[in-house]
Amino acid sequence: MLFKKIDDINPLILLIDSCQYTNQIMNSYRHRNQTTSFIRKETIDCNIQLPRKIESDLLLSLSSNTDDYIPIINSLSNEDHINILKYTIVIDNVNYLEKILNCTSIDLSVNDDILLCTAIINCSSECLLYLLDKGIPIDFCDNYAIRACCIRLEKYIYTTRKNKSSCDMLKIVIDRGGNVNTHNYEPLYSAVNDNNFDKIKLLVENGANKLSDFKRKITNTNLEIFQYLIDNRVELEVNFDDIFLQSIINDDSECMKLFIELGANINSIPTLELTKIIINARHEILEILINYGLDINNINDKINNEINDNRCEDYDETIKTVELVSNAGIDIINLLKVVIQNALSVYNFTYPKYSI
């Protein structure tokens, strides 16, 4: 059934297109830039940055039951005080944090962003709760807390892994009143792209009601997640053509079918993507496309247009070579099979899985 329909595609123009794209596919669909702009470097790199002797004396005195740390603190600059506070937060030691705050003039209302951001990004739950109890609002720094908790914070953690995970931190933030739909529903978007079902359930159970790709494309597809969102009546404000293409890239046949049923246009697939599917010999994906109504005439037209729109010296050489082979009577269908097999053997094409 599949190959009977495949024969309807003009093999000559498909061979031209396949040959021309073979060397481009290795560099296509690189990982999209998923750097999170609101994650501040100074909240991750948290060394005390003091001379070794002073640092050693300070940590020793902080761990004792004496006040020997006070003269050391008093001899340091305000910048040093901030660095020391950040360090105590990174190691999540509330006792040290309180001692430093009590003997300095640091104003939490002025430095709340750097201190709380450090607590969030390092999953320092005890220090986070302490600072919140001191009156710092949960929506500090443009709702940083809940936005950061919905990405995979563990990859940023500076010190040894703590007992608390970013999901635990998210629960704390939500319990303290964090806005689950802030920034155009960014928390749920981040949790979906992180493929974190626990965070998704936590957000939905606490009022997250829309998945939006308004700011960035959704790169993760997971049938269980999307079925959960649908079952819980979460509005999907997404470009189904884009996410359908992403499911193809992710080799996710089940999500492909779901997105087609939700309204994705199966004929929106670009010719380059179809070429890559064929070059990669991804039989199951191709079979779904055809069985769900891929317009073969439209594909032939697209490939013809692609060839005409990208005419250049190299492309002309490709066309001349393929036409010469065809005119000589060489079996184009079998030759295309060889091209695909050689491409698989030589280049080992793969579709990279996206991660955050």
Curated annotation (Swiss-Prot):
Keyword flag Metal-binding: no
Alphabetical UniProt keywords: ANK repeat, Repeat
First and last residues of every ANK repeat: 111-143, 152-182, 183-213, 215-238, 239-266, 267-298
Entries under PROSITE patterns matching the protein: ANK_REP_REGION, ANK_REPEAT
Stretch forming the signal peptide: none
Keyword Lyase set for record: no
InterPro entries registered for this protein in UniProt: Ankyrin_rpt, Ankyrin_rpt-contain_sf
Domain of life: Viruses
Protein's recorded name: Putative ankyrin repeat protein R599
Record organism: Acanthamoeba polyphaga mimivirus (APMV)
